[in-house]
Amino acid sequence: MPVFELIQDLPIFPAVSHAREDGLLAVGGDLSETRLVEAYRNGIFPWYEEGQPILWWSPDPRLVLYPEDLKVSRSLRKTLRKEIYTSRINSAFDRVVDACAETRLSRGDGTWITEDMKKAYGRLQRKGFAMSFESWADGELAGGLYCVKIGKCFFGESMFSKRNDASKCALVSLVRYAEKNGIRLIDCQMRTDHLIRMGAHEIPRKIYLQQLKRLVPRYTQKRDRYEYNSRPALAS
């Protein structure tokens, strides 16, 4: 399959059926709010390292977590009962993103959370399209995660933990928020054993896209806002 080169300032994507076997769909473009929201609406996300062009992915299968499927282990239940952590939402978004990047770098893994990515997701958060869920202990940020929120879907990006179970508690906080606020799907993007143990599972990309159509609003440029309507997604 070819890899498509995106046109700067033109926030459209090829259909995800054109993605390579590894999920890579396109290269280039920008990290504007409009393009990022359009990407997530259509099952696409950016993932690249410093020095690379922006790479856009849509893997098949897709790892998802439905709020009702969350699995909380016995040890995590014990941590939650002890109330070791205080849960907060959006109180330190930029710090959570920084900590996610620093955690990967400290492990020698490299990171896709570049400075441009940090700025882009910060802009999304200020516009209401991104959130952080945080675990605090003794006045310090102990763990957390950040995600994109569009319509009735969360799109998980990254998580970190400086203390035992802190990121898991943040995920529990996210799921509780989802249950209370009508969020039906949490996109975990790519398989990890950690999330599988907590109830996530893989589904075919085709099914994932069908669910996005029902749960994510379409963009109406004339009104400059997102609303639910019946227009098909570009990536279907």
Spans of model-derived segments:
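N-acyltransferase acceptor-side catalytic subdomain
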Residues: 1-236
